[in-house]
A protein has these predicted regions:
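Transmembrane beta-strand segments that form the barrel wall of outer-membrane beta-barrel proteins
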Residues: 65-71, 78-82, 111-116, 122, ...
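Residues that define the transmembrane beta-barrel architecture of outer-membrane proteins
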Residues: 86-92, 130-135, 190-194, 201, ...
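N-terminal periplasmic/intermembrane-space "pro-region" immediately following the signal or transit peptide
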Residues: 25-87, 93-97, 101
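Outer-membrane beta-barrel "beta-signal"
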Residues: 202, 400-404, 449-451, 463-477
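Detector for outer-membrane/organellar transmembrane beta-barrel domains
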Residues: 252-254, 275-421
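Membrane-embedded beta-strand positions of outer-membrane beta-barrel proteins
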Residues: 61-67, 110-112, 151, 198, ...
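Outer membrane beta-barrel
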Residues: 99-216, 249, 454
Length: 477
């Protein structure tokens, strides 16, 4: 057993070391210091929604064409049920983020993405070729200089970490057709939740209250070939009543802890966000949430039965502890910006107590080997992992995350981003590198390469996607 634990940990350490060695030229780059490149979430525990006066509102609209090629593995130990991931896809979309001042301290905010898409597994033309994602649409009222009230669909984000946010409670089911594995982009591009939000700020603190009503019943997890065209998909965001109360108070000049209380359905969670500066270049942060719940496996099987995807009376395909008890989620790390560079590095440790243990992973693979010939077993096994992805939960209990962002890398107007997500239990992982070059104020070209690695009996080595290549062209309007 000791050999099993040590080897993946060593491999994970080697990957992290190699990650930083690849970026070492940036540490000596002679650029202007830009501490603003530290992710805003890591600078201090902010309010749930940062209030922006209408006079400072901006409009951001652009056209983008993104072509993705995804090589697939054909030697999976656990066969992936249909539909298999698309091997290629092209998406042309109009992305809009607009705000209009209606007068009397009232603004109307809209964020959405209109998609035209073609893929090897989608008939063209068809209703799947045209899609619209309504991310946000809400009225914002400012009764006084320190109070804001929002009504409508709002993307509320919480958390100080980068790779995983335990206190980002409204993340569940909100990500639709992601083009990247970068969590900082997924947080911005996801669906908002229909809600009433109130916020009050004062010198040294803030308080935010949110109520999101249930307007529909829970639905089955969507696949790539059954996404609706113009449905706002409130079933993804408003299938249960949800409440959030959060407050931050400045204890000192550089320490403003944030406390959160969240309730959804029959479960209650508490959380906190803590940041502290270490010198001029480093910020350490801790994000924690905890509450009563069952294991990820039990939750997935229960949701599958509730929505009709899995037979109600079928026994669990692998052992699942349905007992609800207090479980913890943690993201701890630091952000570092070297002197005289435009580079920001993040290194984090993630703990998801409800996630797969090493024994759970062995059970998952063994169930397929022993019972995969029984109809429904392999789809049920993959459903558990699809549920984790849909909920934006880590699949495994222990993981590490590394991210680097370098603006004006080597030449002006070139931005490089790289990240790694590593399972500390089996040493498998995902690597992604992105390059964007800003040709002018209105044109950008970019590329992205993704690689999953690990043994066939590992989290990432068992995925059908071996990696991916994305090419994009952006025209700002």
């Amino acid at each position: 057993m000791r050999r099993f634990i040590t080897s993946p940990a060593r491999r994970a350490g080697e990957v992290i070391c190699a990650f930083f060695l690849l970026l070492s030229p940036a540490l000596a780059a002679d650029e202007d210091t830009d501490l603003n490149l530290i992710p805003p979430a890591a600078q201090a525990a902010p309010p749930a929604v940062v209030p922006v006066p209408a006079s400072s509102a901006t409009q951001r609209n652009y056209l983008e064409d993104a072509f993705t090629f995804t090589p697939l593995r054909n030697d999976l130990l656990v066969p992936y049920p249909p539909p298999t991931p698309a091997s290629w896809e092209d998406r042309l979309f109009l992305d809009s983020r607009d705000e209009w001042n209606l007068g009397n301290n009232v603004t109307l905010d809209y964020s959405g993405r209109f998609n035209l898409r073609a893929a090897n597994d989608i008939p063209f033309p068809s209703h799947e070729s045209v899609r619209n994602d309504l991310r946000e649409l809400f009225l914002s009222l400012q009764p006084d200089d320190s109070t804001w009230i929002d009504l409508g669909r709002v993307n509320v984000k919480s958390g100080v970490a980068v790779g995983y946010n335990p206190t980002d409670f409204f993340r569940t089911r909100a990500v639709v057709e992601p083009l990247t594995a970068d969590p900082t982009i997924l947080r911005e591009d996801r669906l908002g939740t229909l809600m009433l939000l109130g916020q009050h700020v004062w010198t040294g603190g803030s308080v935010t209250a949110v109520f999101a009503p249930k307007v529909t019943q829970p639905t089955a997890i969507y696949t790539n070939i059954d996404l609706p065209s113009f449905d706002p998909m409130l079933d993804r965001t408003n299938a249960q009543d949800r409440f959030l109360l959060k407050s931050s108070v400045a204890v000192s000049n550089d320490f403003s802890p944030e406390l959160l209380l969240y309730h959804a359905g029959d479960r209650t969670q508490v959380g906190t966000n803590l940041t502290v500066g270490i010198g001029q270049q480093t910020i350490a942060y801790v994000e924690w949430a905890g509450g009563g719940r069952a294991s990820l496996i039990a939750d997935a099987l229960a949701y599958g039965r509730q929505t009709g995807t899995l037979p109600k009376q079928a026994p669990p395909v692998i052992p699942a502890d349905a007992t609800q008890y207090f479980q913890n989620d943690l993201a701890a790390g630091f952000s570092y910006t070297p002197v005289d560079t435009k580079l920001t590095l993040n290194l984090e440790y993630h703990y998801h107590e409800a996630g797969f243990t090493s024994q759970d992973w062995r059970n998952w693979f063994n169930a397929a080997a022993q019972h995969g010939n029984i109809p429904g077993v392999d789809p049920a096994l993959w459903y558990i992992r699809s549920y984790a992805q849909d909920q934006q939960e880590p699949e495994t209990r222990h993981s590490a995350f590394v991210r680097a962002d370098w603006t004006d890398a080597f030449v002006t107007d070139l931005e490089l981003t790289a990240l790694a997500n590593i399972n500390l239990q089996d040493g498998s992982g995902l690597l992604q590198a992105t390059a964007d070059y800003y040709l002018s104020r209105v044109w950008t070209i970019g590329g992205q390469a993704t690689l999953t690695f690990g043994g066939r009996r590992s989290e990432f080595g068992s995925l059908p996607q071996a990696g991916g290549i994305l090419l994009r062209l952006v025209r700002y309007l």
